A protein has these predicted regions:
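Residue-level signal for well-ordered alpha-helical scaffold segments within enzymatic catalytic domains
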Residues: 308-312, 355, 382
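Charged, non-catalytic interaction/linker regions at domain boundaries
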Residues: 15, 53-301, 369-370, 378, ...
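Histidine-centered, metal-coordinating catalytic motifs and their short helical/loop contexts
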Residues: 340-368
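Short alpha-helical "patches" and their helix-cap loops
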Residues: 320-334, 396-408
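Charged/polar positions within long, soluble alpha-helices
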Residues: 315-318, 354-362, 385-393
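Amphipathic alpha-helical interface elements
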Residues: 1-68, 96-100, 253-332, 340-348
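Composition- and surface-driven signal marking solvent-exposed, interaction-prone regions
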Residues: 306, 322-327, 362, 366-376
Length: 446
C-alpha cells in the first residue's frame, strides 16, 4: 500500500470512530490524547475492525519499517486518530482537515532525523537585541509568546517557563538549543539524548569564560519538534533553577569571535579529553562553573570553588600557597609591580580558603578577601579561558609534562615567561584570546 492509497482506510477508521462516539455519547476529550497513555481510550479505538486495516497499512510502509519499526504500528495508528481530533472542535470528519493531517504525517515520514529543541530562561542577562544566533543550533531570543510558539514552545512548556521566571536574576531573554539524530527504531521513544542540555551548558560556559557577570540558565525544557507527533507525549526537563544574587552579564557583542572560539574549544575538549591542558582542566572547569551554580549561594563557597579551579590548573603537592600565587601572578601580570600585587592577593585568597575549609571563623582580613571574591574569579576566568583555547589548539604545543615539571623554570626567566604568556594568549589585560602564533614551547625551556 502506498502512502496515497493509505488515506482511504484512515478516513474509514475516523468515520467509524465518529459513529461509535456519537452512539455512546462520548465527548471530544475522549478522542484526544497520546497513544498508550490511557489503555481505556486506546481499546475504544483498537476494537474497531477498521483499526486493523490501517495498522496493516502502516506496517507496509517502507519508511515506517526503516525509521520507526513495525512494532510501533499500533502506536502510530492510534496517534493518527488522536491527532486528528486534537485539531478539530467537532466529532465529525472534515476532509480538508484530514488532508492537512495526512500531509503532515507524510512530511514527517520524509524527514530522516528527529529534531529535539529545548528552551530555558536566561538569568542575570542583558542584551539590546531580540535575537542572536550563536551557531550550533543555539540562539538567544527576547521573551515573546509568539516567537516561542513559532519554535514549538506553547501550552505546557510556556506555562512552565513562565512559572520558572521569577526571583533574583530573572531576565527578558531565553536560550534555545536544538539538535538532531537520525531516525531509527531504537531511538523512536527518545525525547532527548542529553545533547540539547549540553549545548545550553556549553553556551553558558563560553559566555562565562569571556566576560564577567552572573549569567546562568534555569531548568531546561526539552521536547521533540515534529510536523506530526508519532505518539510521544510529555515534556522532558533537566537541570534546576538556582537563584543567585549578583550583577548582570551584558552580552559582549564585540567579542563574538572569542565566544565562537571558546564554544568550539569546549566542544572539542569534550570529545578528545582535557589531557593537553595544564593540570586537571576538567575539574577546573567544573569548579569554575560551581561558582555560579552552587546552591544555596554563599560567598565563602564561591571563594573555595575559585581556589579549587586554580589548584586544578596550577597547583602543586608542596608549598601550595606560595607556588600557586607565584604561578598565577607570573602568568597574568605584565609588570613587576602587578606581579607583586597579584602574588600578595592570591596568597591572601588562599589563606582565606584555608581558614574556611578547616572550619575557622573568618577574621577582618579574611572578610576583606571574601568581599573581593569576584576579583579572584576574574583571575580564574582569564587563566581558564586561555587554557581552554590552548588545550583545544593542535598548532600550539608544549613538551610532555611541561606544566608539571618545567613551568616554574620558565616563569623565573623574563624572556621565556613573556614568550609563554604570548603562546597562551595572556600577554594583554583583556580576556583570553587566540594568539597569532603556531610556535612550540620547546625553544623556551632548552
Amino acid at each position: 500500500m502506498t502512502t496515497d492509497e493509505f488515506k482511504k482506510p484512515l478516513e474509514r477508521l475516523l468515520n467509524a470512530v465518529v459513529e461509535k462516539a456519537v452512539t455512546e455519547g462520548l465527548d471530544l476529550r475522549r478522542l484526544r490524547g497520546v497513544a498508550l497513555y490511557d489503555s481505556q481510550k486506546d481499546s475504544f479505538i483498537k476494537a474497531l475492525p477498521e483499526f486493523a486495516v490501517v495498522e496493516s497499512g502502516i506496517k507496509d510502509l517502507d519508511q515506517v519499517r526503516a525509521q520507526y519499526g513495525i512494532e510501533q504500528s499500533s502506536r502510530i495508528t492510534l496517534q493518527l486518530v488522536y491527532e486528528y481530533f486534537a485539531r478539530t472542535n467537532a466529532i465529525s470528519v472534515d476532509c480538508a482537515l484530514l488532508e492537512k493531517l495526512w500531509a503532515d504525517f507524510v512530511t514527517e515520514l520524509d524527514i530522516p532525523v528527529w529534531r529535539k529543541r529545548g528552551v530555558t530562561n536566561l538569568r542575570h542577562f542583558q542584551l539590546e537585541d531580540l535575537h542572536v544566533d550563536l551557531g550550533d543550533g543555539v540562539s538567544i531570543h527576547g521573551r515573546n509568546p509568539d516567537v516561542l510558539a513559532s519554535l514549538g514552545f506553547q501550552g505546557e512548556i510556556w506555562e512552565r517557563l513562565v512559572a520558572d521566571w521569577s526571583g533574583f536574576g530573572a531576565s527578558s531573554h531565553i536560550l534555545v538549543a536544538e539538535s538532531t539524530i537520525p531516525k531509527r527504531p531504537d531511538n523512536f521513544i527518545t525525547i532527548d539524548n542529553g545533547e540539547v542540555w549540553l549545548r545550553c551548558h556549553r553556551a553558558i560556559g563560553a559566555m562565562r569564560l569571556i566576560a564577567p557577570g552572573e549569567v546562568g540558565i534555569s531548568t531546561t525544557f526539552v521536547q521533540r519538534v515534529a510536523h506530526f507527533n508519532v505518539g510521544i507525549g510529555g515534556v522532558h526537563s533537566t537541570g534546576a533553577t538556582v537563584q543567585t544574587i549578583g550583577y548582570p552579564y551584558t552580552w559582549p557583542s564585540e567579542q563574538r569571535s572569542l565566544y565562537d572560539s571558546t564554544y568550539a574549544a569546549l566542544a572539542h575538549l569534550e570529545r578528545i579529553g582535557y589531557r593537553k591542558g595544564p593540570g586537571n582542566l576538567d575539574l577546573a572547569l567544573r569548579a569554575f562553573m560551581s561558582t555560579y551554580d552552587r546552591f544555596p549561594f554563599a560567598v565563602d563557597t564561591k571563594l573555595v570553588d575559585s581556589i579549587t579551579a586554580l589548584e586544578a590548573m596550577l597547583g602543586t603537592e608542596s608549598e601550595i600557597a606560595f607556588k600557586l600565587s607565584f604561578r598565577v601572578a607570573s602568568l597574568l601580570a605584565s609588570s613587576d609591580n602587578q606581579r607583586a600585587e597579584l602574588l600578595k592577593a592570591v596568597k591572601g585568597f588562599y589563606d582565606t580558603r584555608s581558614r574556611i575549609v578547616h572550619g575557622g571563623r573568618p577574621g577582618k582580613k579574611q572578610n576583606e578577601y571574601l568581599a573581593a571574591v569576584d576579583d579572584l574569579r576574574d583571575m580564574v576566568r582569564r587563566l581558564l579561558g586561555s587554557f581552554v583555547l590552548f588545550a583545544a589548539d593542535d598548532t600550539r604545543t608544549v613538551p610532555k609534562n611541561f606544566f608539571a615539571q618545567d613551568l616554574d623554570l620558565v616563569l623565573v626567566d623574563a624572556e621565556r615567561r613573556e614568550s609563554l604568556r604570548r603562546l597562551l594568549g595572556l600577554d594583554a589585560s583583556q580576556p583570553p584570546r587566540a594568539p597569532n602564533t603556531t610556535s612550540s614551547m620547546v625553544s623556551l625551556i632548552v
